[in-house]
Amino acid sequence: MEVNPPKQEHLLALKVMRLTKPTLFTNIPVTCEEKDLPGDLFNQLMRDDPSTVNGAEVLMLGEMLTLPQNFGNIFLGETFSSYISVHNDSNQVVKDILVKADLQTSSQRLNLSASNAAVAELKPDCCIDDVIHHEVKEIGTHILVCAVSYTTQAGEKMYFRKFFKFQVLKPLDVKTKFYNAESDLSSVTDEVFLEAQIQNMTTSPMFMEKVSLEPSIMYNVTELNSVSQAGECVSTFGSRAYLQPMDTRQYLYCLKPKNEFAEKAGIIKGVTVIGKLDIVWKTNLGERGRLQTSQLQRMAPGYGDVRLSLEAIPDTVNLEEPFHITCKITNCSERTMDLVLEMCNTNSIHWCGISGRQLGKLHPSSSLCLALTLLSSVQGLQSISGLRLTDTFLKRTYEYDDIAQVCVVSSAIKVES
């Protein structure tokens, strides 16, 4: 009859504890009316309780700290800290002790041990302590694997390990929206506005230390989350930048292409990288967390082969008096164009000059500026339309209507220049 040998107990004991900040101790006040049967008994007990604040015993306030009673929650962007202790519970000396701590995520395995060198010996009732730190960068299941190997006095090599599983949760819900800027000089400009909606998904308030946008090399960014009051820059969220649980806050940024990219047509088109958000916050007792989004992308507006924009136009003009505008024509294609300009009158707008004139060849990513003259025969807000550009190489015509709007007033009203 075969008998299984008894399982050998290890000489060393492994303990793993998570290191977190303590919390403020709060008591539940129990009180009653003075004429009730207990009288002043409950009130006296609260006054004698060392965890209460004198004069505010019934407000659930406390000045004492309490250690965490459970593992708690771990959120993405926080620093996971753990205390690892290996204690010699036996009465003999153990040699060649090696403690290794690995963190297994869904995508990788990380070594968190501060040192990979073995300890020569460990006497009875002595211990080996280590503290590990790791900035959590993935959500989902994480497994802390602690392995211990050692050699007994008899020369037998022993090995054991323990697994500690925990979940990493998402602290913030970040949503982004892009808005193309609208200008008086062009129906679509290269400026883009980014709205970032940040929601606190935890169960405790957050102090938002920093929410910034790190732009890509093509853009300059301007934050629009503050206003000027009495010569000082004041946040639109007030002096206390706290974000309560499940609350949402909107941050706004304006991005404008740098000059070296804005002057080259065709570079900023299609899917372009805008940048990434860098968010830093603090929770209870100053525990810091940091989260960086992936590169934000947006679909740049399409201009077609030829882009027409206005560089200069007056806001108000006199009725039946000529005024001047400056147009910029940009070749956004990858081929050379031979352009002809045609000007078609409308019911209210009349072009002055020769229609059908040759503009010459326009190479890829190059531009030319045109000064045009026109007048309006109708008062009110008038839309400028009727420009036609024809590429003689492909016999293709590009139409431009509703380019801009101008306010036409009576000639008796003096227009400020």
Curated annotation (Swiss-Prot):
InterPro entries: TRAPPC13, TRAPPC13_C, TRAPPC13_M, TRAPPC13_N. Part of the multisubunit TRAPP (transport protein particle) complex. GO terms for cellular component: cytoplasm; cytosol; TRAPPII protein complex; TRAPPIII protein complex. This is Trafficking protein particle complex subunit 13. It comes from the Eukaryota. Belongs to the TRAPPC13 family. GO terms for biological process: endoplasmic reticulum to Golgi vesicle-mediated transport; vesicle coating; vesicle tethering. The gene is TRAPPC13. The lineage of its organism: Eukaryota, Metazoa, Chordata, Craniata, Vertebrata. It holds the Pfam family TRAPPC13_C.
